[in-house]
Amino acid sequence: MKRILVLGMALLLTAVAFAQNNVTRFMGIPIDGTKSAMIQKLKAKGFTYNANEDELSGEFNGKDVYIRVVTNRNKVYRIFVSDAVGSTEGNIKVNFNRLCRQFAQNDKYIPQNVFGEYEIGDDEDISYEMSVHNKRYQAAYYQISEADKDTTGFTQWAIEKAMAKYTEEEMQNLTEQEVQHFKIELLMDYMNEKMSHKSVWFMITERFGRYYIYIFYDNELNHANGEDL
């Protein structure tokens, strides 16, 4: 039991707990509510709405972009951001890697991949890989906020998970390598349980020989979950 408690406390120092009533935000705006209300809030941020195309345009993160508001059952669940101007293959790699570094250095995000390794190598032929192997270049993160940093109950959660997997004797006999592996496993489980509804991810897409980055700010709590089936 002592080792389980120590493990729980060690994880407590590095983990972040997430309240379920918090939702993903785009430029500080909660991704929730009606589409019309969201459009008005984005217009207040300086974006211009085109009713014919049902999209907004403006500048975001130093680039000209188009923005679409996506809903499910009249509730916003996604903000979709697209480059307004396409790039060459070489430039899109630079842009993608720069975006990866910006997310990595921003304390509002943690990578969904525990290692956070998303950048594209200099020698990567993305045109070939995408067209021949259907390779997808994507990076995904969980969004956090100061309000999320509530570790209440985390130690008990970690203890219950540990006791469900190991007996006290087995826990005492784990090697340090096994303990470290289990800590990573617990952290990933915790992130999936507490953060998966606050996903921000981006990918490269190709259209007519030009490359674009799509960014998705998702509130999975409002996403379709088969209720209409």
Kindly give the residue locations of the regions a language model identified:
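N-terminal, post-signal-peptide region of Sec/Tat-exported proteins
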Residues: 42-82
